[in-house]
């Protein structure tokens, strides 16, 4: 038999093995999904609270991916200014051999980071009084209240203040709906990341891979998968930094316990990527009772995502083999590759001249959070 015939047979055999593996993986995930409620009931209250938070974060990131909604984002930003900067970066790469591994998509991300921080979004320490337009010592906190019963703007909490100069109430609703944030263009790290991800998804298109990163010690950021660099890239829109996973521990001096990345197809514990100094690692057992239970339940949540992804494919395409092959290539292979390569340390490109300590938020606030760069 010719070598060409052997290659065809080997390729056909490989496809059969992949299809069989994908089918077994799918059936296992379906079975695990049925047992999820029972698995949750066996957890103690500490682990239940932690898992419930992960579920809430995961669910919130399933929203606002409809193309018609994403088009709203494109109508709200200065595309001409962004693409002018992208073209300049591409010219510098070609003429000065600068950033040779970055591709056009990476330049879009870099330029959006700059535009979003310097031209589009505003940081809020305290809300501004509607009458005197001041937001300094005249604004004093008076407590928090819950969201309204009808809540299209997805308010998580309302911070209440009083202007001592005007003697009027001032409120600061913490919006999660990115469409609302396109109007307000202001907030703290949660609002910044929600709005930034929404715009980034609109710019890069439906095939882009973007995920939300949640830290248990009250910070959030995001990542996208760079086809040029062939890995997940850290982005912090609040700070305007690109590919700086060492930022939090080594620059801010922040102590952390857990960091999770929430993508469309799976959740990944990325604590090792971002907690880069052993003296900044908070014992994970301070927030949970069983590391094993948390890992197993995250596996269950990932099974849910896998089943949902396959079900959505099956709604539009009836070819089972094709759907199983797509499931392998678009979900299983990527997840397994990241899971098995977590221990490989990747040399990251560093942004030049990053100042020490967190730049967003006032000095008292960053110091209270252990993010001011002082050990």
UniProtKB/Swiss-Prot annotation:
It catalyses: Hydrolysis of an N(4)-(acetyl-beta-D-glucosaminyl)asparagine residue in which the glucosamine residue may be further glycosylated, to yield a (substituted) N-acetyl-beta-D-glucosaminylamine and a peptide containing an aspartate residue. InterPro entries: Papain-like_cys_pep_sf, PNGase, Transglutaminase-like. One of its GO terms (biological process) is ubiquitin-dependent glycoprotein ERAD pathway. GO terms for molecular function: metal ion binding; peptide-N4-(N-acetyl-beta-glucosaminyl)asparagine amidase activity. The lineage of its organism: Eukaryota, Fungi, Dikarya, Ascomycota, Saccharomycotina. Its cofactor is Zn(2+). This is Peptide-N(4)-(N-acetyl-beta-glucosaminyl)asparagine amidase. PANTHER family: PEPTIDE N-GLYCANASE PNGASE -RELATED (PTHR12143), PEPTIDE-N(4)-(N-ACETYL-BETA-GLUCOSAMINYL)ASPARAGINE AMIDASE (PTHR12143:SF19). The gene is PNG1. It is found in: Cytoplasm.
């Amino acid at each position: 038999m010719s070598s060409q015939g052997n290659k065809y047979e080997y390729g056909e055999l490989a496809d059969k093995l992949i299809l069989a593996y994908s089918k077994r993986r799918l059936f296992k995930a379906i079975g695990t999904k049925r047992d999820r409620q029972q698995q949750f009931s066996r957890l103690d209250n500490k682990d239940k609270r932690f898992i419930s938070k992960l579920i809430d974060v995961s669910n919130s990131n399933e929203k606002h991916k409809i193309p018609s909604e994403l088009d709203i984002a494109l109508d709200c930003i200065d595309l001409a200014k962004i693409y002018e900067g992208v073209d300049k970066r591409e010219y510098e790469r070609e003429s000065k051999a600068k950033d040779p591994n970055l591709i056009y998509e990476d330049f879009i991300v870099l330029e959006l980071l700059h535009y979003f921080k310097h031209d589009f979004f505003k940081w809020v320490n305290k809300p501004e009084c509607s009458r005197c337009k001041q937001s300094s010592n005249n604004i004093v906190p008076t407590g928090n209240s819950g969201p309204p019963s009808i809540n299209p703007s997805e308010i998580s909490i309302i911070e209440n203040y009083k202007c001592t100069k005007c003697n009027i109430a001032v409120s600061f609703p913490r919006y999660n709906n990115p469409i609302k944030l396109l109007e307000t263009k202001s907030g703290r790290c949660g609002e910044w990341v929600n709005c930034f991800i929404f715009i980034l998804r609109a710019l890069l298109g439906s095939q882009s891979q973007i995920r939300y990163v949640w830290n248990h010690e009250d910070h959030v950021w995001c990542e996208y998968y760079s086809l040029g660099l062939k890995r997940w890239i850290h982005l912090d829109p609040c700070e305007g930094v690109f590919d700086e996973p060492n930022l939090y521990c080594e620059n801010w001096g922040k102590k952390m316990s857990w960091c999770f990345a929430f993508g469309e197809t799976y959740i990944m514990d990325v604590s090792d990527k971002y907690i880069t100094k052993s003296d900044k690692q908070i014992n994970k057992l301070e927030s949970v009772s069983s590391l094993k239970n948390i890992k197993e339940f995250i596996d269950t949540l990932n099974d849910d995502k896998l089943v949902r992804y396959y079900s959505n494919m099956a709604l539009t395409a009836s070819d089972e083999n094709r759907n199983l092959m797509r499931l392998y290539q678009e979900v299983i292979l990527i997840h397994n590759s990241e899971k098995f390569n977590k221990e490989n340390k990747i040399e990251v490109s560093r942004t030049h001249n990053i100042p020490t300590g967190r730049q967003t938020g006032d000095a008292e606030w960053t110091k209270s959070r252990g993010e001011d760069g002082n050990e």
